[in-house]
Amino acid sequence: LEPCCHQGKTPPCTDIIIEKKIARVFVGSMDSNPLVAGKGVQILRDHGIYVETGILEEECLKLNEVFYHYITTKTPFVVMKYAMTLDGKIACATGDSRWVTGETARAQVHRMRGRYRGIMVGIGTVLADDPMLNCRVEGGVDPVRIICDSNLHIPLASQIVKTASEIETIVACSQEALEAERKQEKIRKLKEAGIQLIGTEGAHGVNLVELMKKLGEQN
């Protein structure tokens, strides 16, 4: 990634490169951050440092795709995970089947949970499976659990609510549900359990576009 040239959470990379008198710099991909966006390369060249850009650019763009997505959209990079049979089913009609995937795929899912900042499901999954949505890989970090629950149907006795003080948990609902008088007692109990509530505007459940923007603001 192009060396940064602004003061953020860390000092400018360009300053230390100049200070250490590094003669040549090879850049894979340019920084899409408007605070950098080519300025880092120009500063180095202005100080007589040889800079070559575009080294393995496609590979670098892929490597940094999460960063590029966030820095240009200010919304989370989302990966969809789903499992289904060859005929397009995810479970038996009776609900008897527990696993569609095998052990290898399930292990990969938990590795993904350890790598990604959050995991999102709908209220239907919570009601049907009462999941923990934690990371079960040794040394892994539990992701932030995000539940899309338009009308706040999440049971207070669910695993999600009972463990919200241990694992960061967000419940996204409609703004209407968040402001409804009849929901205030439940909202109080959810907050006491350690759950953060996010309301979104919209006539058809949780507004995912608005939710992504609000989640991005929490980074």
Predicted region positions:
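Zn2+-dependent cytidine deaminase-like catalytic core
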Residues: 1-59, 144, 175-179
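Residues at alpha-helix termini
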Residues: 20, 47, 193, 218-219
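Short, flexible helix/strand-to-coil boundary loops that buttress conserved ligand/catalytic motifs
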Residues: 29, 64, 94
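Short capping loops/turns at secondary-structure boundaries
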Residues: 33, 37, 53-56, 71-75, ...
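Short Asp/Glu-rich motifs
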Residues: 36-37, 63-64, 132, 209
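Proteins enriched for Cys/Gly/acidic motifs involved in redox and nucleic-acid/cofactor modification
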Residues: 41, 55-83
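Active-site ligand-binding patch in enzyme domains
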Residues: 69, 79-86, 90-218
